Every structure is written in structure tokens, then in C-alpha cells.
């Protein structure tokens, strides 16, 4: 059965066993935000704090992201926030290609249900997100990279500033 709502799809994500990652995690992290979101943010994969809570971007990178959203008058509660990979990776390593492949259809279905006007892809792994015609995609750096590197922080801030201006 093809899920018709985000809630239906969330349940499928929580019970997914298509790759090895579920074995060493506490929670799948499907994403959160309203089904009628006009903006979606896509990261790489959940970290430790996200694995504990089952919610995306609640750790240090999430706090930084929230600050940048607020500075640009973007209310996080109106945005759908998720990752291309739905489980934490061991030692926060970059997801392997087969892990991205296993999760990408979930993300594509999420975006197909929401049909946001814009999707911000944060980081090189998220840039692999399959595109849906009619949605504008914006590629930027991941918030964790923006926190560590001045040049990337500048780009991240500029990208969100441009997003808020559109």
C-alpha cells in the first residue's frame, strides 16, 4: 500500500529494515513538520541526539539551524525537516551508498506528499536527493560544516538569507 499521509509513511520508516543501520540505533528519524509545508529542509542523517529523541536536528547542528532560521524570519514549525538517511550511522560517519539508496525512496515519497515549493538540501549527501519536477531545489552546506568552517558558515548564512528574500 502506498502511504497517503506523512503519518502513514512515518510508520513505514520506523519499521524499515532495508539496510543495516536500524540494528544499532534507538529510533528511526522520519522527519517532522506540517504536511502542507511550503519549505522542506533535508540533511544527511540523524546524529546521537536525534537518535535518542526520534526528531531531526535537535543537537548542536539543529540549534545552529534554528538560530539561522530565526534570523531570517523562518518559523521552524512551518517547515518540514528531515534527512535523506533516516537512521544514525555508526560514529556519525558519512552514509554508504546502499544506505542512501535504501532511504531515498522514503524521502521522495515524503516530498511527493508535501509538495513544498522549495527544498533546501544541506550537505553533499543530501544533494543526492531525487528531484521532483515543479519543486525548486537549493543546495547549501550542512549546518554542522557551517558551524566549523568560516567560509562554509558564510555560504550557509547567505543561502538562507537569499531563501528568505524570495
Where are these regions (language model features)?
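A polyanion-binding, active-site-adjacent surface
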Residues: 1-166
Amino acid at each position: 500500500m502506498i502511504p497517503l499521509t506523512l503519518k502513514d509513511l512515518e510508520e513505514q520508516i520506523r519499521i524499515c529494515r532495508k539496510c543495516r543501520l536500524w540494528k544499532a540505533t534507538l529510533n528511526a528519524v522520519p522527519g517532522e513538520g506540517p504536511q502542507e509545508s511550503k519549505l522542506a529542509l533535508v540533511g544527511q542523517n540523524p546524529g546521537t541526539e536525534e537518535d535518542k529523541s526520534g526528531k531531526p536536528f535537535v543537537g548542536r547542528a539543529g540549534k545552529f539551524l534554528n538560530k539561522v532560521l530565526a534570523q531570517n524570519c523562518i518559523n521552524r514549525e512551518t517547515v518540514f525537516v528531515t534527512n535523506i538517511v533516516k537512521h544514525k550511522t555508526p560514529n556519525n560517519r558519512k552514509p554508504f551508498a546502499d544506505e542512501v539508496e535504501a532511504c531515498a525512496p522514503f524521502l521522495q515519497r515524503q516530498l511527493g506528499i508535501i509538495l513544498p515549493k522549495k527544498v533546501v538540501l544541506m550537505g553533499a549527501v543530501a544533494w543526492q536527493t531525487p528531484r521532483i519536477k515543479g519543486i525548486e531545489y537549493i543546495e547549501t552546506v550542512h549546518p554542522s560544516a557551517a558551524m566549523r568552517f568560516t567560509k562554509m558558515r558564510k555560504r550557509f548564512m547567505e543561502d538562507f538569507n537569499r531563501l528568505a528574500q524570495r
